[in-house]
Amino acid sequence: QQFLELLENRYYTFYLDEWVFQKEYANETLQNHFEVKNLKGFGIHEVKNGIIAAGAVLYYLSETQHNQLKHIQSVTRIAEDNYVWMDRFTVRNLELYTPNSVNAVTLLDVIDKTISPMGGRLLKRWLALPLKNIDAINKRHELVKFFIDSDDFSQTTTYQLKQISDVERLISKVATGKASPREIVLLKDSLKAILPIKSASEKSTNKTVQELGKQLHTCKDLITKITETLFDDA
């Protein structure tokens, strides 16, 4: 009783029935959401606890937030062997994000030179999950070296990234039906700003950059649709 009282005073709680945590229900929930016959394509079909957790999260979101969850398009298993795992005490003691004293400088403060909200979030995830695979580490280093050595490419990419709004946030608002006309215009402008990055990447001499460029979708139909529907000063 004391534990429950303490829990209720410090945290928000939301009751879920036991059937929400059954593997069969969770599996069906995920398959229906992603519109697939099985979860093999996501590499989680044998991860029982992961399936249950992901299914419960989707159910919780549908009950408490909204039914429009189509912007959640994938589920990925974090392979423990690929990353260095750190508990919250280690993260705190290393001062990765939060300083332990008033005048201290965190690692994030030192290395965060990102120029977009998406890049900032990605860097935080990379700090939280350091790579263990040497090839993957070297691949990142080679990309950094390419940006340093290729002034024209670096300048083009930097300039275009500065024209891009927080696309992840905008897409989430669109999916939930909460985006304003002005935000839709910002999304269009952001998609247009990606096109020069895609072109420069595909023409680069670095194979990894070329592959990244090929993965960028032009979204030309969407850009045209928004342009024909809304004025820029909407």
Each language-model region and where it sits:
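Charged catalytic and DNA/RNA-contacting regions of genome-maintenance
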Residues: 1-146, 159-175, 179-234
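Conserved interaction-surface patches within small, structured recognition/assembly domains
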Residues: 148-154
